[in-house]
UniProtKB/Swiss-Prot annotation:
This is Palmitoyltransferase ZDHHC15. It catalyses: L-cysteinyl-[protein] + hexadecanoyl-CoA = S-hexadecanoyl-L-cysteinyl-[protein] + CoA; L-cysteinyl-[protein] + tetradecanoyl-CoA = S-tetradecanoyl-L-cysteinyl-[protein] + CoA; L-cysteinyl-[protein] + octadecanoyl-CoA = S-octadecanoyl-L-cysteinyl-[protein] + CoA. Autopalmitoylated (in vitro). Residues 1-20, 78-172, 235-338 are cytoplasmic. The keyword Thylakoid does not apply. It is found in: Golgi apparatus membrane; Postsynaptic density. Residues 42-56, 194-210 are lumenal.
Length: 338
């Protein structure tokens, strides 16, 4: 894999940038640690008196907590996958590109090299997608992250709360992190609520525990509402096989822009992210389909076989292998006007 193609910055500035980028993660970690203390100690061990209730609360809480922490860890420390060297402009072409002053001639150099690569999406003007910073042709759905300083396969967005770029290699972990974070907040809110009422009405009077329990409910509710909207938005994206970037900027193919260019049907869209083994969908292990460089495309398939477009209106049961087989027979060529 390629090392990150980073813009040259003074060493001191880079160091400060790296340190500051961890601030949101530290904030979230401190809130989670406090919530663990408040729930386990102040609620379960101090406030709850029924032994059976206490044991049940602690058992379920730690199960949800471990899943939440596991997915958060994976979202933070799973590096985004980068394009391989075959997408990097070779030395000879790079020399020609750098020495050429005419933009049209530069586009022609890139287009000639890109004909050897499995790339089908284009810029808005129809040119080959090329990263000037990394000096490489961008694979489909790949974008350059200015924060990470590198091109990321199937880039969705850069998330400051995990200090990582979310893309092909870790999007499943990010979704599971949102889901288990919501479940964590929901479970805390549901189990704390009855004791919140008791403290609020002064039925219980433990001063220190009262503060933690009352504040715990407010924090859990606040995070749950925020996460609910974010998770719902990403569920919508997954159902359409889109990334956040593609939702804001429609992918462009040879025949033009198509916001549903990668839409394969809800079931197959889910499998693109979570894989075919449903027993592994809720576990933070990598199961996404493909290699990160090529993707089944509805537009490519339909342009090759127009009957497929009508057929898809009635049947949505093609396997990913069949869909990919259709797409692999379709090749898109860029024509540069002189």
């Amino acid at each position: 894999m390629l090392a990150g193609c980073r813009v040259a910055l003074p060493r001191g500035l880079r160091c400060c940038q790296r340190v500051l980028s961890w601030v949101p993660v530290v904030i979230i970690s401190l809130v989670v640690l406090w919530s663990y203390y408040a729930y386990v100690w102040e609620l379960c061990l101090v406030t709850v008196t029924n032994p059976a209730e206490k044991a049940a609360y602690l058992l379920i809480f730690h199960t949800v907590f471990l899943l939440f922490i596991w997915t958060y860890w994976k979202a933070i420390f799973t590096p985004p996958k980068q394009p391989t060297k075959k997408f990097l402009l070779p030395y000879a072409e790079k020399e020609r590109y750098d020495n050429e002053e005419r933009p049209e001639a530069q586009k022609q150099i890139v287009a000639e090299f890109a004909r050897k690569l499995p790339v089908y999406t284009r810029t808005g003007s129809g040119a080959t997608r090329f990263c000037d910073t990394c000096q490489m042709v961008k694979p489909d759905r790949c974008h350059h992250c200015s924060v990470c300083g590198m091109c990321v396969l199937k880039m969705d967005h850069h998330c400051p709360w995990v200090n990582n770029c979310i893309g092909y290699s870790n999007y499943k972990f990010f979704l599971l992190f949102l889901a288990y974070a919501m479940l964590y907040c929901l479970y805390i809110g549901c189990t704390v609520f009855q004791y919140f009422i008791l403290y609020w009405t002064d039925t219980l009077s433990n001063g220190r525990a009262k503060f933690h329990v009352l504040f715990l409910l407010f924090v859990a509710l606040m995070f749950f509402i925020s996460l609910m909207f974010l998770f719902g938005y990403h569920c919508w994206l997954v159902s359409l096989n889109r990334t956040t970037l593609e939702a804001f900027s429609t992918p462009v193919f040879q025949s033009g822009p198509d916001k549903n260019g990668f839409h394969l049907g809800i079931r197959r869209n889910l499998e693109q992210v979570f894989g075919k083994e449903r027993k592994l969908w809720l576990i933070p292990v990598f199961t996404s389909l493909g290699d990160g460089f090529t993707y089944p495309m509805r537009m490519a398939c339909e342009s090759r076989n127009p009957l497929l477009a009508a057929e898809n209106q009635w049947e949505d049961d093609l396997t990913d292998e069949e869909s990919q087989a259709y797409c692999e027979t379709s090749h898109i060529t860029v024509h540069i006007e002189k």
